[in-house]
């Protein structure tokens, strides 16, 4: 056997040392067994001594103890590696699940966005359609109202033409009416008739009578109506109905006096007209 120094023992680990001792003792046992078998030396006893057997047993026990410790360490290491691997796999799986969830969330958001966009487009199309329908309805209403407005305007124009001017005009200032202007021009044309002596026309009163004067007054009231005068003026000759007032054909009107050519302004000192040249 080769002696072991302390330095070499410290340098070797226990597992190697125990293994070397086991090999050494086993070699010694085999050598003694062979010597006994071939009986080269009759003094050699069979088997080991008690001390040798005890040393070999201790070494084997320690060796197996180290193997068990190593086995436990390896098992622990394997368990740790397995746990790390499982944790890595679980983390990877978790990341994959998160990635899948993220993709699904993005897909759902895209679908929701597309749906909102589609709904917005449908709403815009609906609003546009409603706007077009409203425009069409407005156009139809305008087309329907336009003939009515034209008809109403024509009716107003027709009413304006057939309405007296005094009834249509509305001025802030006091303007003389057509009747007043006509009366003033009549007075200025014929002068003052208050001083005229109408005793020469007594024959007319006798011929006509009081009833004729009443009819004349009624006729004048009718002539003073602007609407009747306006209608009579614009109406055709065949449409004008001359009222029958019962006056005879010899009844003289103001137009008859105008036809005589009397100068109403040529009066004498007593404000009397000179009718000598006329045969009445």
Curated annotation (Swiss-Prot):
Compartments where located: Nucleus
The keyword Signal appears for this protein: no
Signal peptide interval: none
Superkingdom of origin organism: Eukaryota
Region (Disordered): 212-247
Keyword Transcription regulation: yes
Gene Ontology cellular-component annotations: nucleus
InterPro entries recorded: Mediator_Med2_fun
UniProt keywords, alphabetically: Activator, Nucleus, Transcription, Transcription regulation
Biased composition (Polar residues): 226-236
Protein family membership: Belongs to the Mediator complex subunit 2 family.
Function statement: Component of the Mediator complex, a coactivator involved in the regulated transcription of nearly all RNA polymerase II-dependent genes. Mediator functions as a bridge to convey information from gene-specific regulatory proteins to the basal RNA polymerase II transcription machinery. Mediator is recruited to promoters by direct interactions with regulatory proteins and serves as a scaffold for the assembly of a functional preinitiation complex with RNA polymerase II and the general transcription factors.
Subunit composition and interactions: Component of the Mediator complex.
UniProt protein name: Mediator of RNA polymerase II transcription subunit 2
